Protein backbone atom coordinates (compact mmCIF):
# COMPACT_ATOMS: atom_id res chain seq x y z
CA UNK A 1 0.00 0.00 0.00
CA UNK A 2 1.39 3.33 -1.06
CA UNK A 3 0.09 6.87 -0.69
CA UNK A 4 -0.33 8.52 -4.06
CA UNK A 5 -1.80 11.80 -2.79
CA UNK A 6 -3.28 13.26 0.42
CA UNK A 7 -5.23 16.49 0.59
CA UNK A 8 -6.83 18.55 3.36
CA UNK A 9 -9.72 20.98 3.05
CA UNK A 10 -10.71 23.37 5.81
CA UNK A 11 -13.18 26.18 5.31
CA UNK A 12 -15.86 27.34 7.73
CA UNK A 13 -17.15 24.27 9.54
CA UNK A 14 -15.80 21.91 6.87
CA UNK A 15 -12.64 20.02 7.90
CA UNK A 16 -11.96 16.97 5.76
CA UNK A 17 -9.32 14.89 4.03
CA UNK A 18 -9.19 13.06 0.71
CA UNK A 19 -6.48 10.63 -0.31
CA UNK A 20 -5.58 8.17 -3.02
CA UNK A 21 -3.84 4.94 -2.09
CA UNK A 22 -2.16 2.69 -4.61
CA UNK A 23 -3.24 -0.88 -3.86
CA UNK A 24 -1.26 -2.72 -6.55
CA UNK A 25 2.18 -2.27 -8.06
CA UNK A 26 2.15 -3.00 -11.77
CA UNK A 27 4.14 -1.19 -14.46
CA UNK A 28 1.18 0.50 -16.17
CA UNK A 29 -2.35 0.04 -14.77
CA UNK A 30 -3.07 -0.21 -11.06
CA UNK A 31 -5.88 -0.32 -8.55
CA UNK A 32 -6.34 2.67 -6.27
CA UNK A 33 -8.57 3.36 -3.29
CA UNK A 34 -9.90 6.86 -2.88
CA UNK A 35 -10.35 7.52 0.84
CA UNK A 36 -12.17 10.49 2.27
CA UNK A 37 -13.93 11.75 5.34
CA UNK A 38 -14.52 14.49 7.82
CA UNK A 39 -12.40 14.55 10.93
CA UNK A 40 -14.01 12.49 13.64
CA UNK A 41 -16.15 10.47 11.21
CA UNK A 42 -15.61 7.09 9.56
CA UNK A 43 -13.60 7.16 6.35
CA UNK A 44 -15.30 6.18 3.11
CA UNK A 45 -13.70 4.48 0.11
CA UNK A 46 -14.14 4.00 -3.59
CA UNK A 47 -12.04 1.60 -5.64
CA UNK A 48 -10.66 2.77 -8.98
CA UNK A 49 -9.55 -0.35 -10.87
CA UNK A 50 -7.01 -0.59 -13.67
CA UNK A 51 -6.21 3.09 -14.07
CA UNK A 52 -2.86 4.54 -15.06
CA UNK A 53 -0.88 7.20 -13.18
CA UNK A 54 -2.22 9.95 -15.46
CA UNK A 55 -5.82 9.12 -14.52
CA UNK A 56 -4.86 8.89 -10.84
CA UNK A 57 -3.26 12.34 -11.04
CA UNK A 58 -6.38 13.65 -12.77
CA UNK A 59 -8.50 12.58 -9.77
CA UNK A 60 -6.10 14.40 -7.43
CA UNK A 61 -6.05 17.53 -9.58
CA UNK A 62 -9.84 17.72 -9.33
CA UNK A 63 -9.54 17.86 -5.55
CA UNK A 64 -6.94 20.63 -5.76
CA UNK A 65 -9.31 22.54 -8.04
CA UNK A 66 -11.96 22.21 -5.32
CA UNK A 67 -9.65 23.79 -2.74
CA UNK A 68 -7.87 20.82 -1.17
CA UNK A 69 -4.27 21.49 -0.15
CA UNK A 70 -1.65 18.77 -0.67
CA UNK A 71 -0.24 17.69 2.69
CA UNK A 72 2.50 15.33 3.78
CA UNK A 73 2.26 12.69 6.48
CA UNK A 74 3.61 15.00 9.20
CA UNK A 75 0.93 17.61 8.47
CA UNK A 76 -1.71 14.88 8.22
CA UNK A 77 -0.79 13.74 11.72
CA UNK A 78 -1.42 17.29 12.95
CA UNK A 79 -4.79 17.82 11.26
CA UNK A 80 -6.17 14.27 11.69
CA UNK A 81 -4.14 12.27 14.26
CA UNK A 82 -6.41 9.21 13.95
CA UNK A 83 -6.14 9.04 10.16
CA UNK A 84 -3.42 6.38 10.05
CA UNK A 85 -5.40 4.06 12.32
CA UNK A 86 -8.64 4.69 10.43
CA UNK A 87 -6.84 4.27 7.12
CA UNK A 88 -5.42 0.89 8.06
CA UNK A 89 -8.91 -0.38 8.81
CA UNK A 90 -10.29 1.10 5.60
CA UNK A 91 -7.37 0.01 3.40
CA UNK A 92 -7.59 -3.60 4.54
CA UNK A 93 -11.28 -3.57 3.73
CA UNK A 94 -10.64 -1.93 0.36
CA UNK A 95 -7.98 -4.48 -0.62
CA UNK A 96 -10.43 -7.27 0.10
CA UNK A 97 -12.89 -5.70 -2.34
CA UNK A 98 -10.40 -5.60 -5.24
Q: Where is each model-derived feature located?
A:
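Ser/Thr- (and often Asn-) enriched beta-sheet segments in non-cytosolic proteins
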Residues: 2, 22-24, 72
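Short aromatic-glycine-(Arg/Gly/Cys) micro-motifs in beta-strand/loop hairpins
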Residues: 16-45
Amino acid sequence: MKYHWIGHFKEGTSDKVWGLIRLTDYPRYNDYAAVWGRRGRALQTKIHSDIDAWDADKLCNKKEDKGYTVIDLARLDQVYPEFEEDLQKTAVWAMLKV
